[in-house]
A protein has these predicted regions:
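Generic, low-specificity signal for short hydrophobic/alpha-helical stretches with a mild N-terminal bias
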Residues: 91, 95, 121-122, 181, ...
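Membrane-anchoring hydrophobic segments
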Residues: 1-114
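Residue-level detector of solvent-exposed, low-hydrophobicity positions
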Residues: 46-49, 124-127, 599, 699
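Binding/recognition "hotspot" determinant
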Residues: 7-8, 12-21, 141-143, 168-826
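Membrane-interface segments at loop-to-transmembrane junctions
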Residues: 36-54, 93-111, 135-155, 175-184, ...
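Transmembrane alpha-helix detector for multi-pass membrane proteins
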Residues: 64-73, 96-172, 191-202
Length: 826
């Protein structure tokens, strides 16, 4: 009985396969014309087909004409129908009476059509001789078998046969009517339009990349079959067949590309469009890839050579005994299509670089960034980030070696960073949009006869094994025994590992690849590119902060699905991407100041043509220093404070170029506020740092402020000018000026931390708590405890009174509004 079962099963499988093969072969026969018939047979066959087709068309038209003039049609209408019929009959009578005129017009159109056909064939032949005669066979065949071109030629030849048959009817004195005239006129117009279309297509074929359109069409057909998820894709034979077809298409794309790149013609625009088409193909493929079963023969095999250091003793013994090398393993290569497209685009990218078509490279990078969302959704984010890094390495080298314009250098650096930013944004959006249904599977799909997966997290061997086990349980026990939580746990593990992989890729991009780009550009004195990368740091931090928050939340949530501890999950890492990035950022901010200052000085007269990165650098530097005071990071503060005065004074001088042109009297107070803001910010930060040194008891803070002031501010009467400007600020009218809100935020951040410091002792004094310590400075500037204002004065006044006044003559010293310095000097 068992033997009979296997025979029947074999017959059934053979029959099903033969049916599939027949349908597939039949479909190919309809799409591709047989190539093994002779030229004469092909011509006769086409003539016969056109002749038979036109016989049916003409017969149908003649029948319509006869119906229009028949008496029976009068029964279906009233006077209007009769008038229409009379008009048709009069037209038909005139046509037959003057059939010579119609025959002459038709003969003229036939002649014109013949001329069109001859001209077009001549154009095709000249194009072939110029572009394709010496091309590889695969390329010339693509040109020869162009579907649209052949259809246009077929349209002209069909019309010629149609017209000749009508002339034959006229010679035979067979009546023709208005319907035949209308159809003939329409076909004549079609010929004219076809000629215009074909002429335009001839010019299109002057770009030899244009012949690849049919290859892309075949690739998209293959992807369409992969998406069907039914008969063909579920059969191993057809999976392998589609893979072979795709490989042939990729071979043609490679050959076309290599042939074009070897020519000396300038084809940068065509190469750029070709690269974009490849990215679009990859985009479509990633839309369908997650639906392909993990064990499909669509995926190619890859050889992994075994290593001696981790080989089994039996393998090593066998190799030593036979004198051979270790063997190899064969695994599925799930990235074979991506790798082939990558090779093609790498050659194109190198061509654009060699031809100095940097604008094309920049546009292509913009297209590549659009691939980020699909990479995240399809689980290919690791490959995508690695590919971006490869491009970054190549472009880093190019920026160093080639003479870019400043705009191109800045644009290339920015696009590289923006590509990584797109990954951060798309990962966050993907995780935010993913609901709990990703891990809560549909149990009915596991109880069905066929294995179906609704999510890419179901497309794994262990999930397939659970399905097969449940099918066995149902057959033996009549019901499912495997608990639902166990199935959800297995699926949740794959989701968990996918998020971990995203975390590692974000960490690489943020804390290694982007800083490496900035470092490389700095080392090679490419200040414009480095400046742009540094300017993006705050945006990178913001996007990384949001992404890591969602990552951490999802990882913690997924760990709740781990019920069976014998199934080992990877440990949840300490999600600290932003903290690591902050350390790098603070350590490199001085380099940002350096490259930005150099760029501004070198392009002082044309700086307004570029983004105001000097202003961004100054503002973010202040933010770093404020945060360093709050977090008591002296080393960070010390390394960045030395750049503060130079950057702020440089930016003040740049702003003066524009402010000096403002002559309106009513705007002078605002002009003064903008001009003095850099001095306020420097003095404010210096004052808070000195105050923090006084409160914390760490003298390094005060020594740093005093040392830098003596070194930089006391020379050339700079300190005196500082005091004059600060005095002007003290005496100005109360109002909201530029950056006042920002200054208030800085003050609130610092004073909130300082007021809660345990080193400040308080004592009760009637209804208040006042400072109870030995510091003359704190006794002079601190308000009562829990007051709205922590300080009695502005922070910049602390710097002016306590630090600046030390180095000034008595008549040049700064005086505060309420004279608190008198108490301090006592």
């Amino acid at each position: 009985m068992e033997k009979m079962y296997w025979k029947v099963r074999k017959i059934k499988n053979d029959l099903v396969f033969k049916i599939k093969a027949f349908l597939h072969t039949r479909r190919d026969k309809l799409e591709v014309k047989k190539e093994n018939i002779s030229f004469k047979q092909s011509v006769m066959k086409e003539v016969f087909k056109a002749f038979m087709k036109n016989i049916f068309i003409i017969a149908f038209i003649l029948i319509i004409d006869r119906i229009l003039v028949s008496k029976e049609i009068q029964c279906f209408g009233g006077n209007a129908t009769q008038k229409l019929q009379n008009w048709v009959m009069s037209i038909d009578e005139n046509v037959m009476k003057d059939s010579g005129i119609f025959a002459g017009v038709l003969s003229a159109i036939i002649g014109v059509s013949g001329v069109f056909l001859g001209l077009y064939c001549a154009n095709i032949m000249s194009m072939y001789a110029e572009k394709y005669a010496n091309a590889p066979q695969k390329i010339s065949r693509l040109f020869e078998s162009d579907i649209v071109t052949n259809r246009c030629i077929q349209t002209i030849t069909n019309y010629l046969i149609f017209s000749i048959m009508i002339l034959f009817l006229l010679v035979m004195q067979i009546d023709i009517g208005i319907t035949m005239i209308i159809v003939s006129g329409f076909k004549g117009l079609e010929i004219i339009v076809s000629f215009g279309f074909m002429s335009r297509r001839t010019y299109q074929f002057s770009d030899m990349y244009y012949v690849t359109n049919v290859v892309y069409k075949d690739m998209y057909k293959i992807l369409l079959h992969l998406n069907k998820g039914k008969w063909f894709i579920n059969d191993n034979n057809f999976q392998n067949h589609y893979k072979k077809q795709a490989k042939k298409c990729l071979e043609v794309l490679t050959e076309v590309n290599d042939y074009n790149l070897e020519k000396e013609e300038k084809i940068s625009v065509s190469v750029e469009n070709f690269m974009k088409n490849n990215v679009a193909l990859l985009y479509s493929y990633w839309s369908e890839k997650s639906k392909i079963p993990y064990d499909s023969y669509w995926f190619d095999d890859k050889v992994i050579y075994k290593k001696w250091y981790n080989a089994d003793d039996s393998e090593i013994t066998a190799a030593l005994r036979t004198g051979t090398l270790l063997g190899h393993d064969v695994v599925k290569n799930y990235l074979w299509l991506e790798e082939e497209i990558e090779k093609i685009n790498d050659n194109c990218l190198q061509y654009l670089i060699d031809k100095k078509s940097f604008a094309g490279v920049i546009r292509w990078l913009g297209t590549l960034a659009d691939l980020s969302k699909r990479a995240v959704e399809s689980g290919n984010v690791g490959y995508y980030v690695d590919y971006l890094y490869k491009i970054q390495k190549k472009l880093q080298k190019t920026i160093v070696e080639q003479n870019f314009s400043l705009e191109e250098e800045m644009a290339l650096a920015e696009h590289i960073v923006v590509s990584y930013l797109a990954v951060l944004i798309d990962i966050r959006k993907y995780l935010e949009n993913q609901g709990g249904e990703v891990c809560l599977c549909d149990i009915r799909s596991f109880e069905g006869k066929r294995w179906k997966f609704s999510s890419r997290y179901h497309n794994y061997a262990d999930v397939r094994k659970i399905h097969d086990g449940i099918r066995t349980e149902i057959k033996l026990e009549g019901k499912r025994i495997t608990p639902e939580w166990y199935i959800n746990q297995v699926i949740a593990k794959h989701y968990y590992e996918d998020i971990l992989h995203m975390y590692y890729q974000i960490n690489l991009a943020v804390n290694q690849y982007i800083p490496e780009l900035a470092e490389t550009l700095l080392e090679q004195k490419k200040n414009a590119g480095a400046m742009v990368v540094f300017a993006k740091y705050s945006e990178v931090r913001s996007k990384a902060k949001m992404a890591e928050g969602v990552l951490d939340k999802n990882l913690s949530w997924l760990l709740e699905f781990q019920k069976e501890k014998s199934i080992i999950w990877k440990d949840k890492p300490d999600v600290n991407i932003t903290r690591k990035f902050d350390e790098i950022y603070k350590g490199m901010s001085s380099k940002w100041c350096q490259c930005t200052s150099i760029f501004a000085l070198e392009h002082w007269d044309t700086y307004e043509q570029y983004p105001d990165i000097l202003g961004a650098c100054a503002t973010y530097l202040c933010e770093i220093l404020i945060d360093a005071i709050i977090e008591n990071e002296f080393d960070t503060f010390s390394s960045n404070y030395k750049n503060l005065l130079g950057v702020l004074l440089l930016y003040q001088e740049y702003s003066r170029k524009e402010l000096i042109q403002i002559k309106e009297v009513y705007r002078q107070s605002a002009v003064l506020a903008v001009y003095t803001n850099p001095i306020i910010e420097y003095s404010m930060i210096s004052g808070y740092a000195y105050l923090w040194g006084e409160i914390s008891g760490d003298s390094r803070w005060k020594e740093l402020i005093l040392e830098n002031t003596e070194k930089n501010v006391t020379k050339n009467d700079v300190g005196k000018k500082f005091c004059e400007l600060l005095t002007t600020i003290r005496n100005r009218m109360p109002a909201f000026y530029y950056r006042d809100i920002l200054h208030t935020q800085w003050c609130q951040k610092v004073e909130t931390v300082l007021s809660s410091n345990e080193n400040i002792r308080w004592k009760s004094d009637r209804f208040y708590e006042v400072y109870d310590g030995e510091s003359k400075l704190l006794r002079s500037v601190l308000s009562v405890r829990n007051e709205h204002d922590f300080l009695k004065c502005e922070a910049f006044e602390i710097y002016a009174v306590v630090v600046l006044n030390r180095f000034l003559q008595e008549d040049s010293k700064y005086r505060s509004r309420d004279g608190w310095e008198d108490k301090y000097y006592e």
